[in-house]
Amino acid sequence: MNGDAPKVGYVGLGQMGSAMAGRLLETGVELIVFDLDPETMAEAVGLGAEPAGSTAEVAAFADVVSICVPDAHHVSSVLDGLGESAVVGLPVLVHSTIHPEAMAACRMQAAIWGGVLHDVCVAGGAVAASAGELALFVGGRADLPPAAAALLSYYSSHIVEAGPVGSGAAMKLAFNVLTYAQFAASAVAFEIAEGAEVDTDALVDAWRHVGQLGSLTEQFLPVLSIPAEHVVGDFRDSLRSTVDIARKDLRLAADLCVVGGLGDMVEALEKAMPEVFGVADEIWEAL
C-alpha cells in the first residue's frame, strides 16, 4: 500500500456498487473495477476508475477488494478469480446480502489462498452511498486489516460492529425485513386511500409529521403513483430486478426466523413483492 490511501478493487457495478465506487473516486481513492456489463464499466472508467479485464487483474492491483454482486454463488465465483493472483493477506470486503452461513463459507474459501474476508453489508440505498452516508453492518470489525478499516468512513456515516464474521449479513437481513415491510404497508395504505378517494399527499404529510416515514420508504413512494401503463420497457425490467433482490433477501430472512409463525409472515411478504412494486403478472409469477 502506498501512503495512507489503499488502492481499491471493486467487483460488481450494479446500482449500489456503482454508487459506492463513485463515492470512492470522489474521495480520491485509486480504484480498479470489474463488471460483466460493459456499460457500467464505461461509466466507472469515465469517472476515473481503471478498468480490469478479470477479477484476477483486480486482485493483482488492489490493497483491498470490495465485492458487491447479487448472490452467494456470485461471491464464490469472484473469490475463485481473486485467488489466481492475490497476495497472502489481501482483505476482501463483501457488501452483498447473503446468508450468514454462506458468508462464513466464503471466508473459508478466501482463506485457502490467504484472503481475509469480512462481511461489510450496506444499507441506505444508492443515494446514501453517493453522499457517503451509508450504514454498515460489519462482521469481525475488530479484526479488519488496517487497509480495509480505513475505507469504511469513506462511504459510511454509521458503522455497526455486528459481531463475528457472518453477523453483519444477519443484521442486514433483519434490517431489510423492516424496509420491505414498510414498502408493502405503504402500498396497502395507498390502495386504501385511493379507493376511498382521499389525498395520498396528505397521508404522506401526516406520516412525515409523526416521524413514521423512513428515508428509504420515502424514496420508494413515487413508484406507487406511477400509472400501470407507464411501467414498461427498461423501467419495468429495473423494477423486476429490484423485486428479485427483495425476494431473495426475504427468503434468506425467513430461513433465519426461529419462530414458525413469524417466518410465515416473512414468506408472505416475499411473495407480495411483485404486487408491491407493481410488476405482478401471470407469466412472471409462474417463473
Where are each of the predicted segments found?
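Rossmann-fold NAD(P) dinucleotide-binding segment
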Residues: 55-116
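NAD(P)+-binding Rossmann beta1-loop-alpha1 motif at the extreme N-terminus of oxidoreductases
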Residues: 1-67, 90, 161, 195
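Rossmann-fold dinucleotide-binding core
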Residues: 8, 78, 97-174
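Glycine- and other small-residue-rich loops at beta-strand/loop junctions that grip anionic moieties
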Residues: 67-68, 95-96, 137, 162-163, ...
